Each structure stands twice: as structure tokens, then as C-alpha cells.
Amino acid sequence: MSAAEIELAHIVRTLRASSGIAHKGDIAQVVRALATPGDGAARGGAWAAPVGDDCAAIPCDGGGYLLLAIEGFVNEFVAREPWFAGYCGVMVNVSDIYAMGGRPLAVVDALWSRDGDAALPLLQGMAAAAETYRVPIVGGHSNRRSDREQLSVAITGRANRLLTSFDALPGQNLVVAFDFRGAYHEPYDYWNASVGAPPERLRADLELLPAIAEDGLCAAAKDISMAGVAGTALMLLECSGIGATIDLAALPRPDGVPLARWLATFPSYGFILSVDDAHVDAVAARFRSRELACAVIGRTDAGRKLQLTLGGQARATLWDFNQQALIGCAPAKETDHA
């Protein structure tokens, strides 16, 4: 095997064993448990976006969509980083809304703590993020007699035109966008490009997503989650019933950050979009105009596999949806992309 083949094989093994992708795989059991035969719940029923997307999307009588999302946080993270956990509770929900082509309206939270003092840094973190992103915290639930701190945060928003995980098509470009104006929140693989950044800049950077949707430049996107770039791409491809090839050599990353770590990173501002040839230059130009890193890293196809390459020197299959589901949210019937 060549050096590139050895490196790529190691990357594939590492990604398949990663906790980020494993956590996403847990979604499949939940989808099966909540689906009722005959009612279409597993595919979204009457809702605009099927189960498995970054937000639920409910059509509004007057047009547009009501968006709903929720995040829960690992207890160890909440215990070690209470202020940052509170901040992330708002930040990641805001990102989910924008990833769907929407704009946030309000946040609610569920916070359990040992007492009022233990809850304070979590509340302060949420308040700081709410001010940064101009999203009010309008209510929630609290329990100050718990044996530990636990946090979950939910959000609602509105979208005029959706970006979804279910509308990528074969023959499109996989485009990623990142904000490199940050640093790792050590020791975690969290690239923090939000705390301390100018709030006006953060909000304007996020506004690119609904503008791209409303201008008809793209219909499919996801925010890059704890599953990293490859894991997020897997979810997008599975939901759309397609495959892709991604060239890891084309993946932009901050100076000095090893590829292996960047592939495992939650980037705070990071999105993957599936874009037609006719619009790819316009989409990239919008991100770059705001000093955001943006690049085409791959091409979608009808093969229902995600294959990785390293500058064309090696090729390996990360996931074959013909053999194994990940989150279990593929189209109910095999998609005809002929």
C-alpha cells in the first residue's frame, strides 16, 4: 500500500470508531421507536421536513415554516464547563435554525441543578449567548433540588424557504464553509469562533444561510455537528438517498491543525451545502466576502456510498448505505435519481 492509502485507511477506521458518528448512529433506534406504522411519522408525515433534519419544519397558514429544535448536553461537559455549556446551549440551537434557512425567534431551557449557586454559571452562559445572537430566552423549566447539573435548550424560528437534509441531488457540489477566526477550547475538539467575537459579525455571517435559500441558490444544507465534516456529510447523504466522493485534501482547515483533529472537530460556525454547478461560484463568493473559509470538497452521485480520497492518490469507502444505515432516516422508498 502507498503512504496515501495507509493514511486514508487509518482515517476511515478512526472515523468509523469515533464517538461523534456513534452518537449519530443512536438516532436510528429512536426513529424506529417513535414511528407509527401507516402514519408516515418516520418520514415526517404532513410536516415539511421529515424526521432526521436539523429542525422540525411545520408549514404556517400564512406561508413559510415554523422551525423547532432542541439540544441536550453531556453531563460531564456541563459539570466541567458550566458557563460554556450554557453559552453553547443557545449557540448550537441558533446554528440549527440558520442551517435550515431560518431565523431564530426565541429560546426555552430545562435546567436541573443542586442549588441556585450551581445553576448560576449555566444561566450566565445562556444569557451571554442570547445577547450575542439577539435571541430572547422566554421561559423554561428548572429544578434546583437535583443531584447534578443537567441542561437542555430548545429553540423556535421561522423560515421563508427551507434548506433541508433531504434535498441534495446527484451531480451537485459539496461545499463547506467555516470561520477560522477562533481557537480550540482545549482540551475539547471544539473550535470556538463565537465567544469574544463581534456579535454583529456573527449574526451577519449566519444571515448568509437564509439569504442563500431565499435567493434559490441552494436547497440542501446541514450545520457541521459533533460528528464532524464526514459524519455530517453522511447524514445529509443518507437523508437524501444519495452518495458522494469527498477529497480530504480539498478540505480547508486552520493553520497548524492536523487533518485528523479537524475531521473530529465541532467548528461552532461550519456548514455543508449541496449546490448545483450553476450556483456554486455565487455561494462560495458570499461566504468568502465575509472572510469565511469556503471550498468545494466533493461531488454527489447516485451510489449511496460516501467515498473519501486524498488528492486522488487513494480512495476508500467510509460508509455504504446499501449495507448499513446510520441515522435511519433515508427516504422510505428508494429514490429514483435517473
What are these regions (language model features)?
Residues 1-90, 94-99, 135, 172-173:
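N-terminal glycine-rich phosphate/pyrophosphate-binding loops that anchor nucleotide-derived ligands
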Residues 2-14, 22, 26, 290-338:
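Acidic, Ser/Thr/Pro-rich beta/coil linker or hinge segments at domain junctions
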Residues 47-50, 143, 243-254, 284-311:
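Beta-strand->loop->alpha-helix junctions that form or flank phosphate-binding loops
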Residues 47-51, 59, 67-69, 136-140, ...:
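General beta-strand structural signal in soluble alpha/beta enzymes
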Residues 65-66, 73-75, 103-187, 299-301, ...:
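Glycine-rich anion-binding loops of enzyme active sites
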Residues 81-108, 121-132, 207-213, 229-235:
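Small-aliphatic-rich amphipathic alpha-helix that forms the alpha element of a beta-alpha
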Residues 114, 201-268:
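Active-site-proximal betaalpha loop/short-helix elements
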Residues 274-281:
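Helix N-cap motif at beta-to-alpha junctions
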